[in-house]
Amino acid sequence: MANLGCWMLVLFVATWSDLGLCKKRPKPGGWNTGGSRYPGQGSPGGNRYPPQGGGGWGQPHGGGWGQPHGGGWGQPHGGGWGQPHGGGWGQGGGTHSQWNKPSKPKTSMKHMAGAAAAGAVVGGLGGYMLGSAMSRPLIHFGNDYEDRYYRENMYRYPNQVYYRPVDQYSNQNNFVHDCVNITIKQHTVTTTTKGENFTETDVKMMERVVEQMCITQYEKESQAYYQRGSSMVLFSSPPVILLISFLIFLIVG
């Protein structure tokens, strides 16, 4: 880890040193220097975007920007944006006044999906989060009747689990036990309110299905937890701290 931090330090020092030198180099074509900040003005080639109507940019009587008598931006008598007498946007005389009304905010489906994938905290459940949707596992129960019953009714069983952060549990068994209990309880209550009841066979199968999904959720959350811990260790190492301090010095200086 220390070797990695040292190599990162060397790489960023070389990069930012070059950028720091570039920032200190004088720029040609400054104010009152030989070069022009806007090549094309005052040269034989003319401006890349010549003004229309005979007037220069920002000059009166020729359609300049922000000046009267020429249809400038935001000025009367010339059809400016948002002003009367000229059919501006959102004002009298225009044909598109409704365009000035603010549009209603729309909920992004990507944001909703991202919240579900990351594990959204469920209100009223004491800090439990709802995991992302999973494919229901293929489970064999030991006899043809239950196997067939499961295949025909698996759509009635949960495909998401409720869980708490893994750092609140001492081991996987405690996480899975709590995850199974709260998930089956919530799913049963929700389904019962819709007028559907579960048999003992349904409960038995739900326990097996939810247990497999809770194990999968634990493995996923544990991996993410250890990755976050590794990142914290990396950024707390002395070489990385020195690197960050040096970058701040270059940016401020």
UniProtKB/Swiss-Prot annotation:
Signal peptide boundaries: 1-22
Residue stretches of each Sequence repeat: 51-59, 60-67, 68-75, 76-83, 84-91
Region ranges (Interaction with ADGRG6): 23-38
Main localization (coarse): membrane
Chain residue ranges for the region called Disordered: 26-108
Record's keyword annotation contains Transferase: no
Organism per entry: Colobus guereza
This protein's name: Major prion protein
Residue positions binding Cu(2+) 4: H85, G86, G87
Stretch list, region Interaction with GRB2, ERI3 and SYN1: 23-230
One GO process term, biological-process aspect: protein homooligomerization
Similarity remark: Belongs to the prion family.
SMART domains linked: PRP (SM00157)
Coiled-coil stretches noted in the UniProt entry, renumbered to this chain: none
Membrane topology: Lipid-anchor; GPI-anchor
Cysteine-cysteine disulfides: C179-C214
Single GO cellular component term: Golgi apparatus
